[in-house]
Amino acid sequence: MAQTHGSKQQAQRLEQGAESLRHGAQAQSRENNVSLSTVSHADEPSQRDESSRLTVRMENTYQLGPTKPFPVATVNHILEDVLTTYLQEAQYDPEFCRQMTKTISEVIKTQVKELVIPRYKLIVIVYIGQRDDQSIVIGSRCLWNPKSDTVSSYTFKNSTFFALANVYAVYFE
């Protein structure tokens, strides 16, 4: 219960930060609206530093498959809800989109973790790009077990940009 409360507080902090970013980005006007926005895991140091991580050794359960399947439909609903909530009224701004990719991916990860699906590793990737009569192809390749591993995906579009969110769920044996 305390963990759920903590993750809800984290989600609220992220939403407040996103709201301030949304208003700040809309207040700015840029002369050149065509630009490139990139985000990498190396852009900013992690909130957790390596020394604070505890090494946990778990005994082997000899369980080769999940006890219940990954709830793809529920995660798809989370993706749709989060992307629509955060981006419905937004306009494309490179700095705003850069921050929103981080915020949205953290919110999605927090909400999916609240489903408490045991023994699944989660990877959340969010892409946001400008819609300016161009084409883009986004692909991913994964080596996994199709019986237990899966992906959920949702695409959001408005008049100035598109957003794609993917959640990869890989069963940890």
UniProtKB/Swiss-Prot annotation:
InterPro entries: Tctex-1-like (IPR005334), Tctex-1-like_sf (IPR038586)
Residue ranges, compositional bias (Polar residues): 1-13, 26-40
Domain of life the protein comes from: Eukaryota
Biased composition (Basic and acidic residues): 41-52
Renumbered residue ranges of the record's region Disordered: 1-54
Gene3D superfamilies: Tctex-1 (3.30.1140.40)
Pfam families in the record: Tctex-1
Assembly, per entry: Interacts with ZMYND10.
Family affiliation: Belongs to the dynein light chain Tctex-type family.
Full protein name: Dynein light chain Tctex-type 5
Primary gene name: Dynlt5
